[in-house]
Amino acid sequence: WDPTCGHCKEVLPRLDSFYTKKWKDAGLKMFAIAKETDGSRNDWIRFVTEQQLWSWTQVYYSKADDKSRVEGGIPGYSQLYDVQTFPTIYLLDKDKRIIAKKLTVEQTDDVLNIKRKAQ
């Protein structure tokens, strides 16, 4: 996600609400990577702080990090995971395999509900 993305600013609090109310106590872990585009690390810190997004792991991926990877011949996360838009939601299983990708918050909730019922 991108801390300057208007859509991300709408989606992340909704995602956090679903997570804290339904998924966290079910043992689901959530991990977010904020990718620097037009904003800064301070924009990211401010948004995470204002929205109190503390119940899950937040990581900041700077332009310098991305440049360093590319210059080292290592694809950036956007290339590795085909991230074209922000935010991009992926679901991984307990073995960290991607089981669903590019979901909305509602689709994520639906998939998790189906998975929970199948257990």
Predicted regions located by residue number:
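Structural recognition of alpha->loop->beta junctions
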Residues: 51-57
